[in-house]
Curated annotation (Swiss-Prot):
GO molecular function, one term: translation initiation factor activity
Gene3D superfamilies named among the record's database cross-references: Translation initiation factor 3 (IF-3), C-terminal domain, Translation initiation factor 3 (IF-3), N-terminal domain
Protein species of origin: Bacillus anthracis
Record keywords: Cytoplasm, Initiation factor, Protein biosynthesis
Function field: IF-3 binds to the 30S ribosomal subunit and shifts the equilibrium between 70S ribosomes and their 50S and 30S subunits in favor of the free subunits, thus enhancing the availability of 30S subunits on which protein synthesis initiation begins.
The name this protein goes by in its record: Translation initiation factor IF-3
GO cellular component: cytosol; membrane
Family: Belongs to the IF-3 family.
Oligomeric and partner information: Monomer.
Length: 167
């Protein structure tokens, strides 16, 4: 952002410190006006014809901008991906344990990647793995939405579940 002497335009549309329009002035007049008020002349819209400048305390403005950015970064939620590994021949109790963990992750706001690794000749029966993943996604349906359908990648099949937004 250009301030004071960095502004090269001959004429500028001037906006006062309290937001009122002061009209089109020469750059030097605008600089003098800002200097008399002990404030800075800041170029806010360089592409306008003529460019728009505002009289303000630039140090205070920068401080406010940094404060806003810091607040936005603080309010950003980092969504992490948790993985739950299943097998095509998973027993009922193991399935329920994995399901409880996945639901806990989803309620916390994390995404869940449910994956099945096919070992040996089990890869010839992909439909069994497909059924396990379908059952898993149906069991998590109350707290999640399917972000990506089950798909094969090498010897693994996986699907991604995202938490539901109940806002």
């Amino acid at each position: 952002m250009m301030i004071n002497e960095q502004i090269r335009a001959r004429e500028v549309r001037l906006v006062g410190a309290n937001g009122d329009q002061l009209g089109i002035k020469s750059r030097n007049d605008a600089l003098d006006l800002a200097a008399n008020l002990n404030l800075d002349l800041v170029l806010v819209a360089p592409n306008a014809k003529p460019p728009v400048c505002r009289i303000m305390d630039y140090g205070k403005f920068r401080f406010e901008q940094q404060k806003k950015e810091k607040e936005q970064r603080k309010n950003q939620k980092v969504i992490s991906m948790k993985e739950v590994r299943l097998s095509p021949t998973i027993d009922e109790h193991d399935f329920n344990t994995k399901l409880r963990n996945a639901i806990k992750f989803l309620e916390k706001g994390d995404k869940v990647k449910a994956s099945i690794r096919f070992k040996g000749r089990a890869i010839t029966h992909k439909e069994i793995g497909q059924r396990v993943l379908d059952r898993f996604s149906e069991a998590c349906a109350e707290v999640s939405t399917i972000e990506s359908k089950p798909k094969m990648e090498g010897r693994s099949m996986f699907l991604v579940l995202a938490p539901k937004n109940d806002k």
